Design a protein with these regions (language model features):
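Solvent-exposed, non-transmembrane regions of membrane-associated and secreted proteins
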Residues: 9-196
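Terminal targeting segments of Actinobacterial cell-envelope proteins
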Residues: 1-11
């Protein structure tokens, strides 16, 4: 005796799963596009604001943060890296810019200035940074130039890299490895000393 089983319900289920995956993919692509456009628009707006403040603003005597939280811009010409720096390291900030790490000095102050950004967006070019590369940091106080003295990989809880220094030092922090999928297990550290 032969039993016939209809494949119609299985086919409908598989088609439904297929459409579900397509909808999820479209949603993820849409979200990614929104995040990229939002970051681009934020950076354009803040770059214009920085240029306007630099043009119309008398140089303050103390380190300054604009009312919007804008601190300045980092440029590493050899790497083609240019990113706005704002105060804080919340998820929203790091989605749109590099963030000044609270508790570290501001540019222009003595000590270890800490700046962080995501490895898969703004700090992706750091994978190619080399000793003696020049980092330019433009702020409301003026322009600072730093020379890279070292890079290293540390654990995510190693805050010693941000400890104070008697000199003017810049520390860039991003997740590592650069091509890791998911939450990266380590941090990539770039240490630079001020030269002008």
């Amino acid at each position: 005796m032969k039993i016939l089983v209809s494949r119609a319900p299985l086919k409908r289920i598989l088609e439904g799963v297929q459409w579900l995956f397509l909808a999820a993919a479209a949603g993820l692509l849409g979200y990614y596009g929104f995040v990229r456009v939002d970051a681009w628009a934020f950076e354009q707006r803040e770059n214009r604001a920085l240029e306007q403040l630099l043009k119309n603003h008398a140089t303050p005597r103390l380190p300054a943060i604009a009312a919007s939280g804008l601190i300045g811009r980092i440029d590493i010409q050899r790497l083609g890296l240019s990113v706005i720096v704002v105060e804080g390291i919340s998820a929203k900030i790091l989605r749109r810019a590099a963030g000044h790490i609270p508790g570290t000095p501001l540019p222009g102050q003595r000590g270890n200035v800490g700046i962080s950004a995501h490895r898969d967006t703004f700090f992706r070019p750091l994978r190619n940074i080399k000793r003696n590369d020049i980092i330019e940091l433009t702020t409301l106080l003026g322009e600072y130039r730093y020379r890279v003295v070292s890079t290293k990989i540390v654990g995510p809880n190693d805050v010693a890299v941000l400890e104070g220094s008697g000199n003017e030092v810049l520390t860039l922090v991003t997740c590592y490895p650069f091509y890791f999928v998911g939450a990266a297990p380590d941090r990539f550290i770039v240490r630079a000393e001020r030269i002008t």
